[in-house]
Amino acid sequence: MAIPKVGINGFGRIGRIVLRNALVAKTIQVVAINDPFIDLEYMAYMFKYDSTHGRFDGSVEIKDGKLVIDGNAIDVHNERDPADIKWSTSGADYVIESTGVFTTQETASAHLKGGAKRVIISAPSKDAPMYVVGVNEEKFNPSEKVISNASCTTNCLAPLAKVINDTFGIEEGLMTTVHATTATQKTVDGPSKKDWRGGRGASANIIPSSTGAAKAVGKVIPALNGKLTGMAFRVPTPDVSVVDLTVKLAKPTNYEDIKAAIKAASEGPMKGVLGYTEDAVVSTDFCGDNHSSIFDASAGIQLSPQFVKLVSWYDNEWGYSRRVVDLVAYTAAKDN
């Protein structure tokens, strides 16, 4: 089967890390990038140098108005309106929508006008079908032209929640994500009309925040709809986050059996998506980790046979971007 050709709209954190992952995974080929705010020279610079993931280990050049990475020429567009991007001229059948702006079916479907067959939104969506690789991708229907890869936190939480619910049953639960800083935050205190706390300086504060990640699990795993909710604490670290899932179980059990169930899933049906460790790890140990979720067996605690706190790490940039690549490749295979 031919490798699917892909366009990326929005060359920010996720757009750039998706490209790095695509070059490593080799399951998709990026043939075009659109960003109205980044010219070609700056695009090459931003891709080559990364404060979190390090310098790109390969060649980055500009030739004939194209971005050339390791000999692969990528067309560059600078359109503001997705409907104006000529994806077809580059042969891009699939578009990764990573601006964070066009997150509904209506707005993201504008890419279809330029020749794309399908749009994969790298963010949660209010109305597009959401898929978490390793959890519910088998429900994908090729007739769906706009889909969402959900959020990085949902991608961490859903595999863990699925294993626990399938094995022991979840009656209800609360999630907290201790989340690394992202681009929407402020370097120093600044205006943030909708979220006053979110306007405070990212490097100086632990900032309580809202997140729809836990509720979104109910869309991905219908059996958990209405059973989970959660919140976030934004912390002054550049990357890698951690989920704390505290649940009331339907079936009494012990922590060793919980560990065994998660370990079995990590070595079986969820291999590559769900990881497992018993080491004394900290956040930087997971920078660049491909997994969506890495269960920290030695960090969890159990209060009673039906009440337990589980801890799972995730690289909210790298691991999430790898799943975006995986979802594109999966849907493309279903088209053939």
Curated annotation (Swiss-Prot):
EC number(s) stated in the UniProt entry for this protein: 1.2.1.12
Task: Give yes or no: UniProt keyword Phosphoprotein.
Answer: yes
Quote the protein name from its UniProt record: Glyceraldehyde-3-phosphate dehydrogenase 1
- Organism the protein comes from: Schizosaccharomyces pombe (strain 972 / ATCC 24843)
NCBIfam families recorded for this chain?
GAPDH-I
Q: What does the record give as the reaction this protein catalyses?
A: D-glyceraldehyde 3-phosphate + phosphate + NAD(+) = (2R)-3-phospho-glyceroyl phosphate + NADH + H(+)
Q: Where is this site: Activates thiol group during catalysis?
A: H179
Q: In which pathway does it act?
A: Carbohydrate degradation; glycolysis; pyruvate from D-glyceraldehyde 3-phosphate: step 1/5
Where along the chain is the active site annotated?
C152 (nucleophile)
Subunit arrangement?
Answer: Homotetramer.
Going by the UniProt record, its keywords in alphabetical order are: Cytoplasm, Glycolysis, NAD, Oxidoreductase, Phosphoprotein
Q: What is the similarity comment for this entry?
A: Belongs to the glyceraldehyde-3-phosphate dehydrogenase family.
Where, subcellularly, is it found? Answer: Cytoplasm
Q: Which InterPro entries match?
A: GlycerAld/Erythrose_P_DH, GlycerAld_3-P_DH_AS, GlycerAld_3-P_DH_cat, GlycerAld_3-P_DH_NAD(P)-bd, Glyceraldehyde-3-P_DH_1, NAD(P)-bd_dom_sf
Top-level division of the source organism's lineage: Eukaryota
* Molecular function terms, GO-annotated: glyceraldehyde-3-phosphate dehydrogenase (NAD+) (phosphorylating) activity; NAD binding; NADP binding; oxygen sensor activity
Signal peptide interval: none
Which Gene3D superfamilies does this one have?
Answer: Dihydrodipicolinate Reductase, domain 2 (3.30.360.10), NAD(P)-binding Rossmann-like Domain (3.40.50.720)
| Pfam families in the cross-refs | Gp_dh_C, Gp_dh_N
Q: Which residues carry this modification: Phosphoserine?
A: S59, S125
Which is one Gene Ontology cellular component term of this protein?
A: cytosol
PROSITE patterns per the UniProt record, alphabetical: GAPDH
User: Where is D-glyceraldehyde 3-phosphate bound in this sequence?
Assistant: S151, C152, T153, T182, T211, G212, R234
Principal EC category = oxidoreductase
Q: Which residues bind NAD(+) per the record?
A: R13, I14, D35, R80, N316
